[in-house]
């Protein structure tokens, strides 16, 4: 949660993420309707860094440590939520966005049945450890978004491929598309991640690839002249549109732990998605 801790530190912190989805899409499974949300979060003017908050000493006895800039101090949080007893200090810390995507059962009152938790961030930590939580308009921006909504899950769509329902989630700041099997909503799992961004390029010069995926459209195989299912991704910052052909769906769950070495990058990503136009 800090851009000043000199490394990747994914863990449990005493904060509450407000989902505030930027995109949502509904689909059917098991006779119910489910809603998939990309939990980006978005502040206006009601936020400050936690280092400037007055924290309740009973709830946060270690406030002095938590509010260090290498801990939670740099993280932006809501200034209008969290003073539960209205005594002028904060009993809870509410941050914008959840850095995740969620699935809600709309046939049963909108109950939450799945949330990806920290997995989207952990995937990036393994796939792009030297560009973790980068901004979308500048390369060489390692961890510049750690204190402010992280990768920012922005876009989401779903599609059926060979009898399986697949969710495609786009990360606006980091870039990249996540594939999840959501056929059984409560037991959804990661399939793959691909990022067409070039971290060695120059964003302003237009040589950094796709930047800022803003929207994703799924085109079923029977509606595509090529006979293959594809997704179309609109990238806000680079102004590019890219088509990805779904080459193959893996059977295995490709969950990954947080890693910080180049040698731990995920493999076989391009087997499942293939870029064929921009």
List where the protein language model places each region.
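Short, basic, low-complexity termini and linkers enriched in Ser/Thr/Gly/Pro
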Residues: 252-270
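Beta-sheet-rich non-transmembrane sensory/scaffold domains
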Residues: 1-252
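Short, solvent-exposed loop/linker segments at the N-terminal edge
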Residues: 272-278
